Amino acid sequence: MVGVTSCEEEILEYGRGYSEDVDTIREREYPQLKDTTYLDHAGTTLYAKSLIESFSRELTSNLFGNPHSLSTSSQLSTQRVDDVRLRALRFFKADPEEFDLVFVANATAAIKLVADGMRDSTRQGFWYGYHVDAHTSLVGVRELAEKGGRCFTSDDEVEDWISRLCDVRSESLKLFAYPAQSNMNGRRLPFSWCKKIRDQGETTGGNVYTLLDAASLVSTSPLDLSDASAAPDFTVLSFYKIFGFPDLGALIVRKSAGQIFEHRRYFGGGTVDMVLTRGLQWHAKKQSSIHDRLEDGTLPFHNIIALDSAFATHERLFGSMQNISSHTRFLAKRLYDRLNALRHFNGQRVCELYKSPRSDYNQPSTQGPIIAFNLRNSQGSWIGKSEVERLAATKNIQIRSGSLCNPGGTSGSLGWTGADLLQQFSAGLRCGDDHDVMDGRPTGVLRLSLGPMTNLEDINTFVELVEEFYVEKAATVDSLVAPVHSVPLQQPRFYIESLSLYPIKSCGPFKVPDGRRWEIRREGLAWDREWCLIHQGTGAALNQKKYPRMALIRPSIDLDRNVLRVTCGEPGSTDQKLLEVSLLRENTELATTSLCQRTSKASTVCGDQVTVQAYTSPPVAQFFSDFLGVPCTLARFPPHSSTRYASPRKAPGAWKQYLRKFVMPGSFPQDPSPPPAEKHPILLSNESPILLISRSSVNYLNENIKANQKKIRTGTSKAVAADVFRANIVVAESLADSPKMEQPYIEDQWEALKIGPGELRFDVLGSCQRCSMVCIDQFTGVRRDEPFSTLAKTRKINNKIVFGRHCSLSASEVTQDQHDNAERWTLMVGDIVIPSYAHDYTL
């Protein structure tokens, strides 16, 4: 018999035990994965098509009533709930004589249920200890522990604490919680701690309980509770992490630990045998089972019935959790090894991988199929997690970034102390923001997590993304700045090709007609981003990244009639809708609808809390809500109340700083100390009063797009219009004599501008960092992968993708009386633009 190599043995694990080939299962059961690479199974895995079909048949073939009744339909629901509860226990090999299962919303709800039980079980309160790798929901229990607690920062600390339990006899109730698997990096913690704690705790009165967060583990690994003496007292999990659907969680309780809930104060419908409300305030709790006492109110019985279909579908497709464990272990090892092997041209590692030294991707007992990492460039500088996630999204690759609701694991891996993080919080760092690197360190990580239906193509697709966009093949800066021809500048050389304002934030542009001078204010072009659309539920401003159809909302300013005219739909379509709103703030006599009343409302715009005036007229809300399919209404920035300012920018020589890394020392003179930063007021713009781009730069970018003919997934090499950059000013060059002498990206060296016959002065604040919104076609609302893909390769400064320049009126202009300079404070298509260059820049 021919021997089998270790490599061959590994690949045999790929899909072993599945009903069919992985790709065949994906094509039939997971149509939502078409043209998509999904690598966020730790967040939730995906539901199978046949699961939804099976559940649909259940609902349409049976009548399920509220379980709290004696009707036939209600009893059917009760019977099915009981059956599914037993099936769930057996899935985890939990003996129903030893364990009970309580249905809850999710793992967090189960944790809170245990915490409430511990709090109410004794007047003296309880002590709480948790492992540093705990999910945020486990950390939160500490706020209920009146006896204090401890965060164990290592396994050794836990082992030492366990060994000392028998030395200290205490009546205090104690709870120790930890994750079976870190949701950050997939490291698996010792299951044996539960038995060790129980054995040690029995010598002190058995008052130490264990809580195991199994939510991350059970998504790809079996959980074996067959030995009740070694099992946790409380195990929490979420079924959607295993099956994708239904959205349901569970608390598995060792019955011997059930007395913790005896004194739980709250009771809900269905958990009591009798309640007195008049006179004597008394109630009798149900005693038949633990779940009867804890499942408050009507159970989500439809979801529980769906869980039955989920169990059956999962077993039919994948056979067992052990099969899934082997499959994902093989893929995770391959992905880890490939990322770990990536190097830049100079040998610098591309990936900083955050794997515990205690774990091994070859050992399922120590490591799950999760990989946490960050990227570095060839100089060792960090690449922002947000940029990587945005680029991945343009390629239809779904990943996760941030602190991952794992504050201890993330901060420990990144080297942040509590004092450090408090300081960064004061500096503006918040969960979910794009402060990717602060004080030279990443603030979060990138996470890839695998699931039952992950295949080899998913692994290859992500690694190829990193290789194409982040692995530097050679030391060159040719792609950073386009070549500039060494010819004397013949002034005037630049002029305004087009002027655009965006009256409604994130909607289409209004292009200023040729020959018309347009007012400029400190906040930018008159009427620019003075309105926005806000969600009627949350108050958050809508944007094209979430709602690409906003590009098809076309506002225009009619100064003759003093109205904002809005049309919806593709240009030239016959079914366009029309709305008109008065430009006059107090005028309610509108052409097609009434302004009615406005109400002040707090809204979130680019992370800022902004007070806007929302239009309460139902026709206004209906106009936008019907078109976008989201409940929203129009809102306006209040007059004379700008509390928003342009973001602080790097000095105009930022490109020069970047280039210094590649040229001889002394090539550039030392920069003078920067002047104090000025504040530039804005309305609802993202970052600055005015955004400027160059036609020459757009042309050069399109040349690069066309040159890169390799089409990745659904992307194309089609040229992009300047409109995708949503600039206020497009500057072009006068090239009548020398059409081939364009100077793309020359604007990177501009530090100031004079525009128009009155030479109105502008300051250049810095480069515009770009996001995936530039991939939305402004004429169709269709999302593509360009130009972001090409920009990611050719336009990076300090690891940020940039295109265009932020500008504002010069401070010397705003000190003058605007009324005395009304004509000067205007711009027009065709106005001459005279740039001033950084002091050390020469052609």
UniProtKB/Swiss-Prot annotation:
What the entry lists under InterPro entries is as follows: Aminotrans_V_dom (IPR000192), MoCF_Sase_C (IPR005302), MoCo_sulfurase (IPR028886), MOCOS_middle (IPR005303), PyrdxlP-dep_Trfase (IPR015424), PyrdxlP-dep_Trfase_major (IPR015421), PyrdxlP-dep_Trfase_small (IPR015422)
Q: Which Pfam families match?
A: Aminotran_5, MOSC, MOSC_N
Q: Which residues carry this modification: N6-(pyridoxal phosphate)lysine?
A: K241
Biological or metabolic pathway of the protein: Cofactor biosynthesis; molybdopterin biosynthesis
> Can you supply a Gene Ontology BP term from the record?
molybdopterin cofactor metabolic process
Residues annotated as catalytic: C405
* Sequence ranges assigned to domain MOSC in this UniProt record: 657-836
Q: What is its EC number?
A: 2.8.1.9
Q: Which cofactor does it need?
A: pyridoxal 5'-phosphate
Question: Keyword Transport on this protein?
Answer: no
Q: Which reaction does it catalyse?
A: Mo-molybdopterin + L-cysteine + AH2 = thio-Mo-molybdopterin + L-alanine + A + H2O
Example GO molecular function term?
pyridoxal phosphate binding
Gene3D superfamilies (alphabetical):
Aspartate Aminotransferase, domain 1, Type I PLP-dependent aspartate aminotransferase-like (Major domain)
Q: Which keywords label this protein?
A: Molybdenum cofactor biosynthesis, Pyridoxal phosphate, Transferase
PANTHER family, A to Z: MITOCHONDRIAL AMIDOXIME REDUCING COMPONENT 1, MOLYBDOPTERIN COFACTOR SULFURASE MOSC
Q: Sum up the protein's function in the record's words.
A: Sulfurates the molybdenum cofactor. Sulfation of molybdenum is essential for xanthine dehydrogenase (XDH) and aldehyde oxidase (ADO) enzymes in which molybdenum cofactor is liganded by 1 oxygen and 1 sulfur atom in active form.
Record family assignment? Belongs to the class-V pyridoxal-phosphate-dependent aminotransferase family. MOCOS subfamily.
The name this protein carries in UniProt is Molybdenum cofactor sulfurase
Gene behind this protein? hxB
